[in-house]
Amino acid sequence: IVCKIAEIVVVGGVRRSALISLSNLSDDRMRHAKSGQWWNDNGQRALANNSACYTEKPDMGIFMDEWKSLYESKSGERGIFNRASANKMAEKTGRRQIEGHEFGTNPCSEIILRDREFCNLSECVVRPTDTRETLMKKVELATIIGTFQSTLTNFKYVSSAWKRNCEEERLLGVSLTG
């Protein structure tokens, strides 16, 4: 259902949504959600990245079964996410409150997130005519936009945990694309 909703989040003809699903290693339906020719009957699943989430080192046989399933899917899904490692990385910086949080990740898995949190991601389009100076200016402006965007936390239709987490951390990402 969430993937179907994400299909309609389009601005200027460009999809503006990304999803991640972190499931148990034992969840066989999620393991095979993007196996075979899933795009024929369930094209909306293209909007989500699916990963198995484990909290402790799995048995080698279980891990290899998951790895084999990923290979056989021919879609690069389901990925493997180590929550214990994410918790250690979040703690390592010394800037984040770890107690009481189970960390996950954003759809591309480059940012460690609390449950019910997102990153304010700003994109800079790289053009063939850009110079180092023009790119630095774009990154500066994207940082300002993302910082402002992080203050917009009046989320009327979701739980208050989203507001609390996004205000406490105000995560910001700037990426180059194009």
Residue ranges, per PLM feature:
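Flexible, glycine/charged-enriched surface loops at secondary-structure junctions
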Residues: 1, 9-21, 151-166
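Conserved, charged catalytic cores of large soluble enzymes
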Residues: 4-99, 176-178
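Function-dense linear segments that define catalytic or interfacial modules
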Residues: 72-178
